[in-house]
């Protein structure tokens, strides 16, 4: 099954690019489901009226999703900030398993590494390989 997701940040009115992206995702997911989740983690700038307007604008364009804040579904909640307890639970599980470890690299270190030439490998994660410490390194 294919699942697509649109997650606009309600810091302003929906941009036409969001609608285009969502329309493409909807077309590609024709054999699956499409999930709408509001990315409201920028608490200082996100406003409920923009979240409501995004849904209204996409509905006006005739776009439909299978799951979302306005229709519900099995993977609720569909407002990202309401999912924090789920993330905290996963964090606790990882912590209990000893799978959380600190990274001693700054954002500048990571940015610098991303601009350095290195081999392309689609199977590699985006985080620069040269900055990856062995699992558990730095733990006491």
Where are these regions (language model features)?
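Active-site cores that bind ATP or allylic diphosphates and position pyrophosphate for catalysis
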Residues: 107-140
């Amino acid at each position: 099954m294919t699942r697509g997701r649109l997650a606009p940040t309600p810091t302003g009115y929906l941009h036409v690019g969001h609608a285009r992206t969502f329309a493409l995702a909807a077309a590609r997911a024709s054999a699956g489901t499409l999930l709408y989740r509001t990315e409201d983690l920028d608490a200082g700038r996100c406003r409920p009226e923009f979240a409501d307007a995004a849904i209204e604008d996409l509905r006006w364009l005739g776009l439909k999703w299978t799951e979302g804040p306005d229709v519900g579904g099995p993977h609720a909640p569909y407002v990202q900030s309401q999912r924090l307890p789920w993330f905290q639970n996963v964090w606790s599980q990882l912590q209990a398993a000893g799978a959380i470890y600190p990274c001693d690299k700054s954002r500048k270190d990571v940015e610098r590494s991303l601009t350095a030439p290195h081999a392309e490998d689609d199977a590699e994660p985006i985080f620069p390989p040269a900055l990856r410490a062995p699992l558990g390194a730095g733990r006491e």
